[in-house]
Amino acid sequence: MRKSIGLMLAATLVSSGSAKPREVRHLAPSSQWVVNWADQSCSLGRAFGEGDHKVTLFFDQFEPGDNFNLMVAGKRIDEVEGWPAAAVQFGPNEEPSEATAVGAKTNDTPAIIFQGGQRIAPLTKVEKIARRRNAEDGPPFEPAPIGPAREKAATWLLISKIQHFDLLLDTGPMDAPLAALRDCSWDMVKSWGLDVEQQKHLSAKAYPTMPAYKWFSENDYPTAMLKSGSQAIVNFRVLVDATGKPTACQIQTSTRPKAFDDVVCANIMKRARFHPALSAAGKPVPSFWRQTVNFRLAM
């Protein structure tokens, strides 16, 4: 059994499609959009379908912006093993994007979490190259905002390649729901003690002085969790002062057990150092940095 700890910077897995026509389950909404304003994350959710065919779609966001994590849950959702590839598409105008799927349960209901940071529109080839180029030692690559017009044009979501059927959800225009999600995220930033207007107009975001994956090694895998075969996904954020020093680490969401959370924050506070964020005037200011750590066991 091999152990690995990976920092989730991008999902690049590709799976081949099947030539056989696939069943498509097309579901209309059966509830309104609801935003859950939690202390360390924001979640936008809506139910689709009725009875045993009902599924609930969640957009989880841990910082303001265009990125979110998708989760879909329902009695008829197939349980997923491992970390298989999936495809996610917001139609009718946007191209499909690739994501890594992880099986989960919410209130004993099967669920799938899509890792890798989803957007309404996937990154272009040029944007992906720029992101890879900056990932090692440069400032974070910031693609152009998608904007409300493209979000409004997205009226359905297709999830494919991961179940024995494809799931087509009539979301309706996504501009207003995602705007509500971002409102929650900015309020969350305010609750961290940061100046929201200042954070909205930074000339540079905080970023690590060395590749963040170097903060972790296989030896950091909790021994008890290794023996029990436990794995985890840990979303965290770090407050960074004007000198680039981390001042607080907070777990935003985690699939637990808690031993994984403790390893993440202990390593961050001990090993992480950052280039500080810069205000609109170019002055170093307090800010935050966030990421996801995956603890995986490879058989």
Spans of model-derived segments:
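Sec-dependent signal peptide recognition
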Residues: 2-8
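Hydrophobic h-region of N-terminal signal peptides that target proteins for export
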Residues: 9-18
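An ectodomain-focused feature that recognizes extracytoplasmic/extracellular
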Residues: 20-86
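Residue-level signal for well-ordered, solvent-exposed loop/turn and beta-edge residues enriched
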Residues: 34, 243-245, 283
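Extended low-complexity, serine/threonine- and proline-enriched intrinsically disordered segments
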Residues: 73-117
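Internal interaction segment
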Residues: 103-216
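Short proline/glycine- and basic residue-enriched helix-capping loop/turn segments at helix->loop/beta transitions
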Residues: 199-239, 262-299
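A short acidic/small-residue loop/turn micro-motif
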Residues: 223-224, 253-259
